[in-house]
A protein has these predicted regions:
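Extracellular structured ligand-interaction cores
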Residues: 113, 118-120, 155-161, 171, ...
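Non-heme Fe(II)/2-oxoglutarate
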Residues: 43, 51, 190-191, 218-220, ...
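Secondary-structure boundary elements
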Residues: 100, 108-117, 150-154, 164-171, ...
């Protein structure tokens, strides 16, 4: 397997909490995933004019579950209109991209473990005019843990946002602030003390960086990193992206998706094409695990008749 990230990328992530890796995915992967996006989000149409629901002085729409306890507004709901959990009724190209071997290796490297779990993975399609996608700066720990980020980054998690379309500043790239910059003005403490602090938002915007890039670009960041979505303003513009979040196995302080809860989804599209390594990211025991007995092998085969279980026998 060709490694698609470098030690420098890992070092930057450890220091700054975020790093952009261009051309992480190749043209064929981009083409195949894009085809699946069009299948699972059919008939979506972008407008010629961007939607702006902000009032003068606003710093983006509030996000749900960012520790505010306030109800989600209509605009915020619209931002997540095309935000869906895997698996989908499409090819393995999209269904397995969140557990691509290079993403798994990246997660293992930064979390310093060989045993990682995928705890969130969604396809996200945005279209100009469908919503006002501008967000205020926030951190993901608000809805990924009930406490706060650990001081040991290996006890936190890593989130990947992958673009499968070219993303310019007019296509709603994620903006983020390096950890060393936000720490310089006690960003986390100020956020927790007053989540509506306009001056804090202004300060964060002074240091914001853009993750804009061509299709195949990867943004990796931690749950303690301030970031925000930006609005799509390109006439007829759209953005196809995938989120993929990993944590160390056994880290129960972090969570988001309970995969068995989505049992009605077409899991055969994953089981019939994934490797044992990829399936383990969903919590499926590896070959040789004591879980696998003649009985469990037989029953699991009944559940997924077309799954090739030869490596587990």
């Amino acid at each position: 397997m060709t490694i698609r990230f470098s030690d420098a990328h890992v070092d930057t992530w450890r220091k700054e909490g975020a790093v952009v890796v261009p051309e992480f995915f190749n043209d064929k992967e981009i083409k195949d995933v894009t085809k699946d996006f069009k299948k699972i989000f059919p008939g979506r149409k972008a407008e010629d004019k961007a939607l702006n629901k902000k009032k003068k002085g606003d710093f983006g729409n509030k996000l749900p579950l960012q520790l505010s306890g306030e109800p989600m507004g209509k605009t915020t709901m619209d931002q997540f209109k095309n935000f869906e959990n895997i698996p989908f009724d499409c090819s393995s190209s999209l269904n397995l991209i969140a557990v691509h071997p290079s993403l798994i290796e990246f997660a293992r490297s930064v979390l310093k473990t060989n045993d990682v779990r995928l705890y969130q993975a969604q396809a996200w399609a945005k279209f100009t005019g469908e919503a006002d996608f501008d967000q205020a700066f926030h951190c993901d720990f608000g809805n990924h843990t009930l406490t706060v980020p650990s001081q040991d980054e290996c006890l936190n998690s890593i989130t990947f946002i992958i673009y499968f379309t070219d993303v310019t500043e007019e296509h709603g790239p994620t903006h983020y602030v390096n950890r060393t910059d936000s720490n310089g003005f006690e960003g986390m403490k100020r956020f927790l003390k007053n989540r509506e602090d306009v001056d804090h938002q202004k300060e964060l915007r002074r240091f914001e960086r853009s993750a804009a890039g061509p299709a195949g670009t990867l943004l990796a960041y931690g749950i303690d990193v301030f970031h925000r979505g930006t609005n799509l303003t390109e006439p007829g513009g759209y953005r196809y992206a995938m989120t993929s979040c990993f944590k160390k196995a056994g880290n129960d302080s972090i969570g988001y998706t309970s995969w068995p809860w989505h049992f009605t989804k077409p899991w055969q599209n994953i089981f019939e094409h994934a490797t044992p390594d990829q399936l383990s990211c969903f919590g499926v025991p590896m070959p040789g695990d004591p879980f696998w007995t003649e009985e469990t092998l037989s029953l699991t085969q009944l559940r997924y008749p077309k799954w090739n279980m030869s490596e587990y026998r």
